[in-house]
A protein has these predicted regions:
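Alpha/beta-hydrolase
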Residues: 134-187, 194
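Conserved alpha/beta-hydrolase "acid-adjacent" motif
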Residues: 205-211
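Conserved alpha/beta-hydrolase
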Residues: 28-49
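Gly/Ala-rich beta-loop-alpha elbow adjacent to hydrolase catalytic centers
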Residues: 79-84, 88
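Flexible "cap/lid" loop of the alpha/beta hydrolase fold
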Residues: 101-131, 170-178
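Short beta-strand/loop motif that positions the catalytic acidic residue
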Residues: 192, 198-200, 204
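Catalytic active-site module of serine/aspartate enzymes centered on a nucleophile-bearing elbow/loop
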Residues: 222-258
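Active-site glycine-rich loops that stabilize anionic/oxyanionic intermediates
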Residues: 12-15, 82, 202
């Protein structure tokens, strides 16, 4: 039995480390020691984040997490959600990790991502002059319709109330990666040899299920699981327990927990 195995949770767009809530509790009950960091400035109050986050880069997110991971006693698992999956892969390219859990992954640069629902969700930001250096505020209508489309209204309101702005620079590096001279969203998959599980949902409109399928194909030691009826919010609400069950089974199979 592996006791207190370290796992670092990497949240997605507009969120912070507090988003995990009962999901993190479920991982602790499996035997994991859970870390829930926030992306740079995402732990600040809304207006402070708005003023500072616009020009933060993908490399900033990666480097902050690499520093945390390398401070731990052992290489941890890393669990990413959405944008956090892209950052997780960037992290795993730079430092040793025991395994990766990727839920509704955002695309690395090699993967097509211009699906209609994704354009509808984020397109508004790219119509603003200076989008590449402006913070991207959470858009309520789009968040409800494309991220939490299968969830209860009360949960939608609860989650949205805690969201903060996202980096416009990060989204430019990810969505328009051919303009990024630093090639931040390009990942050398040959440098990552740990076991990987990719989790998707049949009703995920924020990151199309095809992206999850392509992500899994980039790794030799990978498993792809599709949750029937699940939207993008795997860690909350209706699909939380199903997601935890999948993670527990994979964790046991790989000897991470008993």
């Amino acid at each position: 039995m592996v006791l207190n195995k370290e796992i670092v949770l990497i949240h997605g767009t507009w969120c912070d480390g507090n988003v995990w809530g009962e999901f993190a509790t479920g991982l602790r009950q499996m035997g994991y020691k859970v870390h829930t960091p926030s992306f740079r400035y995402h732990d600040l109050p809304y207006q402070e984040c708005l003023a500072k986050v616009g020009t933060v880069t993908l490399q900033d997110y990666r480097d902050d997490l690499v520093a945390l991971i390398e401070s731990l006693d052992q290489p941890p698992l890393i669990l990413g959600h959405s944008l956090g999956c892209l950052v997780a892969q960037m992290v795993a390219e730079k430092t040793e990790v025991a395994g990766m859990i990727l839920m509704g992954p955002a695309p690395t640069a090699d993967i097509f991502a211009f699906y209609p629902t994704m354009l509808a969700c984020f397109g508004k930001h790219f119509l603003r002059w200076g989008f590449w250096k402006k913070a991207m505020p959470p858009y309520k209508k789009e968040f409800f319709k494309y991220c939490m489309n299968e969830q209860e209204e009360s949960l939608k309101e609860e989650v949205f109330a805690d969201l903060v702005p996202e980096s416009g620079k990060v989204y430019t590096q990810m969505a328009l990666h051919w303009f990024d001279k630093t090639k931040a969203a390009y990942v050398d998959f040959s440098r990552i040899s740990c076991p990987v599980i990719v989790i998707s949902g049949t009703k995920d409109k924020m990151t199309h299920p095809n992206i999850a399928r392509r992500t899994a194909k980039n790794y030799r030691d990978s498993v792809l699981v599709s949750l029937t009826g699940a939207d993008h919010m795997y860690e909350s609400g209706k699909f939380q327990q199903k997601t935890l069950k999948v993670i527990k089974g994979w964790s046991q199979q790989n000897g991470f927990v008993d």
